[in-house]
Structures are given as C-alpha cells and as structure tokens.
C-alpha cells in the first residue's frame, strides 16, 4: 500500500508540475487588446479592384473583416521585383501593417505562403509569424495545404537514392491564421437578423477545422497568372472566418481569386494590386462570376 500511495503521489506531483509549466508558457502572451471600434466601409469601396500599392491602402481604419492573401514569392516571376530577402520582408511588413490597420476588431488574416529554396532553405513562414507578432496580431494557428495530388514524379534537385545530399520535394504550403485585437468576431443579434449569417455547411465545418487541407493546385494558364491558388483555398477561409456580407480584402490580388471566392459566397470584396494588367484580368473574371445574394452591400 505504501509503494502504491507513493507512486500515486508522484504521479499527482508530476501532473501538477506539467500544468504549472504549461501555464507559465503563456506568461506575458497577450490574448486580447483594445484596438478601437469597428467602422463602416464606405460603399464606394465595396466590390472593387484597385490598381494601387498596398503599402498605402486608401481604406479607413477598422472596417475590413477578413484578409486572405498569398504574397508573391519573389522567385523570378514576371510580375515580381528582384528583391533581397531583407527587402522582401520589409515590403511584406509594410503591407501587413496596413492590413492590421484596416482590419476590424476581431478581424482575421490568412496568409498563404510556401517556404523557399534548398541550399539554403528560407523559412518564410517563420519570418512571417515573427513579423505578425511584432505588428500586434494574435496567432490562431497554422493550416497545412497538402498539394501532393498535383505533384509530379520527378525528384528534387540533389542526390538520387543516396545519403550524399537528398533534397525534400515540397508538396505543401502554409496558411498562417491571425486575429486583430480579439479571437472572437463580434456579431449583433440585429446583424444576424439582417442577413449577416454563417454560410459554411456542417460537414464542411467539421472537415475544414482540421489542420491539413488536401486539394490540387490551379493551372497558371487557366487564370493568366504565374502563381495562382485555387478558388477552393480562399473559399474555405472566407466561409470559416467571416459572415455573409462581411468585407474581404486581398492586398496582393493578382488575378482576383480571393475576390471571386468572396463574390461566390456573398461577401463584399476589395482587391488591390500593383499590376494594371492583373487588375484588368481580375475585373474580367469577376464579371464572369456568379454572385451569391449579398444583403449588406
């Protein structure tokens, strides 16, 4: 009996220590902050594609509910400048600072990013996580986009079937998810009655709250863009992290995939891009996109 009791006491002590350590991990980490009050989006900005620089968004503070974006990878794509890593990260910082400014309290931001290179390997996702923390964002989690269904059979550069220098084949990207000010996106009863409702089906919610998503990539030729993501990606983010009638922003709009998904799901959209050519492509795609009835705009 004495030995059993001692072992039991030890187990209790270990459990208590683990809980104490786990609690201390969160010391100093903010879970909410005052970021002001939500503002109304000017109606003239709703459902627009803007040719402009997202480092200086002409959008009022605290009026966007969700940002979904995939920054250009700075990987010799025709639309991208040839920036050093520090210059690229500075550019992202300035754009994301503007996104933080325009997001409403409780608003969310989803950044789709792939890590780059092999020799050396550049962990862009890690850089962005640190950057977002510095800007004041609250991190909600990470989703892995499994692209293996679209992967070819060729090997990555490196030694074949040898320990000399095997290289990993990248078949995934990250979706980094953040909130501004609070983890909860507020909604008044009157707003729900006026149509600011959830649109995600039950089965989709159960599947999409898992941290791994699997679906194929988009063909670049289909949307006239060198690095497109499929509509399914922003659609899932929009339905999970916003209500019908909410405002969705993409500061790296490209060919307009996020805006297309927003229009399909009954949200208002704003797309901003430096390229006049891609703005024209996005507008054309949106003209050809069916609109889900949006009750608030």
Regions found by a protein language model. Name each.
Residues 1-21:
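Single conserved hydrophobic/aromatic residue that forms the stacking wall/gate
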Residues 17, 22-281, 287-288, 294-297:
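Core catalytic lobe of class I
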């Amino acid at each position: 009996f004495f030995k059993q009791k001692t072992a039991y006491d030890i187990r209790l002590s270990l459990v208590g220590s683990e809980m104490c350590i786990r609690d201390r991990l969160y010391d100093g980490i903010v879970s909410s902050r005052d970021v002001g009050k939500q503002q109304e989006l000017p109606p003239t900005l709703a459902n627009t594609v803007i040719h402009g620089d997202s480092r200086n968004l002409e959008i009022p503070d605290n009026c966007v509910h969700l940002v979904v974006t995939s920054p250009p990878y700075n990987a010799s794509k025709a639309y991208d400048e040839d920036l050093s890593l520090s210059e690229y990260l500075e550019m992202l910082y300035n754009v994301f600072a503007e996104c933080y400014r325009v997001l409403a309290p409780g608003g969310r931001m989803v950044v789709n990013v792939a890590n780059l290179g092999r020799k050396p390997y550049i962990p862009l996702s890690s850089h962005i996580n640190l950057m977002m923390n510095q800007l004041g964002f609250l991190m909600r989690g990470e989703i892995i986009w499994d692209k293996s269904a679209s992967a070819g059979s060729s090997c990555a550069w490196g030694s074949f079937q040898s320990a000399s220098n095997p290289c990993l084949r990248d078949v995934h990207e990250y979706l980094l998810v953040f909130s501004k000010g609070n983890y909860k996106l507020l909604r008044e009863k009157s707003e729900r009655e006026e149509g600011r409702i959830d649109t995600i089906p039950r089965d989709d919610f159960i599947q999409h709250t898992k941290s791994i998503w699997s679906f194929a990539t988009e063909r670049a030729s289909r949307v006239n863009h060198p690095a497109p993501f499929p509509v399914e990606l922003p659609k899932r983010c929009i339905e999970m992290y916003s209500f019908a009638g909410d405002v969705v922003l993409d500061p790296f709009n490209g060919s307009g995939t996020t805006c297309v998904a927003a229009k399909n799901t009954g949200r208002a959209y704003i797309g901003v891009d430096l390229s006049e050519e891609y703005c024209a492509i996005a507008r054309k795609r949106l003209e050809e996109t069916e609109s889900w009835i949006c009750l608030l705009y």
